[in-house]
Amino acid sequence: MDTLTVSHVKKSFGSQEIIRDLSFRVPEHSVFGFIGENGAGKTTTMKMILGLLRMDGGEILVEGEAVCYGQTRTNRYVGYLPDVPEYYGFMTPREYLRLCAEVSGITRKEADKRADELLEMVGLTKADKRIHGFSRGMKQRLGIAQALLGKPKLLICDEPTSALDPLGRKEILDILSAVRESTTVLFSTHILSDVERICDQIALLHHGEIALQGTMDDIHAMHKGVGF
């Protein structure tokens, strides 16, 4: 079963065509890498999946339900980590997750349980200091925990490893690889080694179109000897 289906999607801003007849599928419990240079249309696509931007054509399905601009019905299936997550810096990570859970309608008992589970998963159980003192990598890990609070069917991460050192990137990628047991992951990046490390499938976006798509084994086989 496919958690996400994008079919013939188009998007323009004024006379500039950003997304051109974009189609791809993300199978359940897979890690899907959306790779492309800055400005290729990755973030625009993610915002359309979230219903934050109107499509000019095509259809997007999450768990078989159509995404509609301005409506958040399908977002009950989705957890989202933006490229630069924002926090209340005066809070500890546990306090912050409890607040997010309360806003989402999760009971206090369940919120405490989920916060403990997720902080352990992302390696922040001993991080009792305020969030304003966190490194970029720690903030990204907390962002993943926040995105997973509601047990989403689809986790969307926009450039989660950008501006991180090699160790920080490895920590994030290890987490994303591990969570495929409980959810499906779509993440964007411009770093080829990231998708090679953990992705089941990738789509290379170039000037708003899919230039290359498939499993890593298929792509390596197609481009054997040409340096991919």
What residue spans do the PLM features occupy?
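Walker A (P-loop) phosphate-binding loop of ABC-type ATPase nucleotide-binding domains
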Residues: 37-41
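Hydrophobic anchor residue at the start of the ABC signature
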Residues: 144
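Conserved ABC ATPase "signature" region
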Residues: 98, 102, 110-126
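Catalytic Walker B motif of ABC-type/P-loop ATPase nucleotide-binding domains
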Residues: 155-158
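Conserved ABC transporter NBD signature motif
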Residues: 58-69, 73-74
